[in-house]
Amino acid sequence: MGYDPRPIGVFDSGLGGLTGFQKLRALLPGEDLIYFGDTGRVPYGTRGRDIITKYARQDASFLMGFGIKLLFIACNTACYAALDTLAQELPVPVCGVIEDASRRACAQTHNGRIAVLATAATVSGHVYSDFLKSLRPDLCVLEQPCRLFVPVVEAGRFSKEDPIVRILTQEYLAPVRAFGADTIILGCTHYPLLAPAIAQEAPEAALIDSGAEAAVHVASILAEKGLSNLPDHKGGVRYYVSDSVEDFTGSASIFLQHPLEGPVERIDIEKF
């Protein structure tokens, strides 16, 4: 069996991808991980597909400069806009977050009614409903845009007791309750931090974390393709952002639920 010491690259529009990154770190402690959060251009979910694809290409180009062995797009919006493009253009495996969450939701639902909470861009592309129905044509799928969830979470507000969070979750979950979904896909990697608030509004529904499901798939790909690092290697982590290092450092520990393990550096993503 071969081993591959090259790092894994992970990117998101901002901080949200750290939820999937954390799961990946827990599953693969022997892998070197490089995270890029495009904090200077967050959110992606309110932008057009061409702009999102441009940003995703720049993010991928930056990470490819480290000689990565796999690219993990820990951003639902970027997956909707650019995953297929990057998979065709890059010489390494490219993993997203949509398909694995969809498969888990199909297995989870009992009444065949699945709701997807996502950014406006992801909803507009209908990538979740299309893929879910390709797996199970009998499903009823509601795609609910949650335009303000990402800015609120990036601002550090996600407590279920926060009045702004309560107003937003009540508004966005009302159609979900009326729809009768028994399974909700958190179709943005920022949303797991809002899980307690979402569960408060939809207590009967199972919540599917798209980033966590995808991280499990990434681990399986490494094993299948012989890309795992040496078994005795202790993996390291590095973080890069396109805006304030201080703001990222202050908020990242909330997403990771522990202090940052590696250095953080600001880069000019427009150069890539």
Listing of model-derived features with the role each one plays in the protein:
Residues 1-272:
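Non-catalytic structural scaffold of enzyme domains
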